[in-house]
């Protein structure tokens, strides 16, 4: 079974070798879905981070400054993941390695 699967995967590139337009279309769809999922995940993560910081500040107001600093660092790291997804989407759209 593994040999058949390997053969199908290996020969798929020959079957779709001349379909440059189809690869471009799928690249646009993949970039849109990938960036949408990354933005959704980033927004959910940022919401949880802000909620946890507000909860921590409400429980201990003396740590508000430290929690705020930590929150901004966490938000920057979350946003960096979304920016990485944007870079990958732009590479898939404008410098597509599958088009040759």
Swiss-Prot record:
UniProt KW keywords? ATP synthesis, Cell inner membrane, Cell membrane, CF(0), Hydrogen ion transport, Ion transport, Lipid-binding, Membrane, Transmembrane, Transmembrane helix, Transport
Q: Show the GO cellular component annotation of the record.
A: plasma membrane; proton-transporting ATP synthase complex; proton-transporting two-sector ATPase complex, proton-transporting domain
Q: Name one GO molecular function term.
A: lipid binding
Supply the Pfam families for this chain: ATP-synt_C
Q: What topology in the membrane does the UniProt record assign?
A: Multi-pass membrane protein
Spell out the CDD domains in the cross-references: ATP-synt_Fo_c (cd18121)
Functional description taken from the UniProt entry: F(1)F(0) ATP synthase produces ATP from ADP in the presence of a proton or sodium gradient. F-type ATPases consist of two structural domains, F(1) containing the extramembraneous catalytic core and F(0) containing the membrane proton channel, linked together by a central stalk and a peripheral stalk. During catalysis, ATP synthesis in the catalytic domain of F(1) is coupled via a rotary mechanism of the central stalk subunits to proton translocation. Key component of the F(0) channel; it plays a direct role in translocation across the membrane. A homomeric c-ring of between 10-14 subunits forms the central stalk rotor element with the F(1) delta and epsilon subunits.
How is the subunit organization of this protein annotated in UniProt? F-type ATPases have 2 components, F(1) - the catalytic core - and F(0) - the membrane proton channel. F(1) has five subunits: alpha(3), beta(3), gamma(1), delta(1), epsilon(1). F(0) has three main subunits: a(1), b(2) and c(10-14). The alpha and beta chains form an alternating ring which encloses part of the gamma chain. F(1) is attached to F(0) by a central stalk formed by the gamma and epsilon chains, while a peripheral stalk is formed by the delta and b chains.
Q: Give the protein name, as stated in the record.
A: ATP synthase subunit c
What organism is this sequence from? Campylobacter fetus subsp. fetus (strain 82-40)
